[in-house]
Amino acid sequence: MFITNILLKKAKSKNILVLMESAVSGHQFTMIRERLADKLELQRFDPYIQKMCLYRERKRLRSLN
């Protein structure tokens, strides 16, 4: 590996955009979290069933600056 590749390499961003999905209805939304944090699980209002339900992180979408 050349030394120029190491010097010109960009640093990884601190935050990433992730896709959250409802465990009940499949409703999805995006959320920002830190790269080093654990996968997200949270309770939030689901507009499809009109109740609070569990949302889990499904996948990473992209990194943010």
Curated annotation (Swiss-Prot):
Transmembrane segments: none
An annotated GO cellular component: mitochondrial large ribosomal subunit
BP terms from Gene Ontology: translation
Gene3D superfamilies (UniProt xref): Ribosomal protein L33
Signal peptide: none
Family to which this protein belongs: Belongs to the bacterial ribosomal protein bL33 family.
Subunit record text: Component of the mitochondrial ribosome large subunit (39S) which comprises a 16S rRNA and about 50 distinct proteins.
Designated name of the protein: Large ribosomal subunit protein bL33m
Organism, as annotated: Anopheles gambiae (African malaria mosquito)
Top-level taxonomy: Eukaryota, Metazoa, Ecdysozoa, Arthropoda, Hexapoda
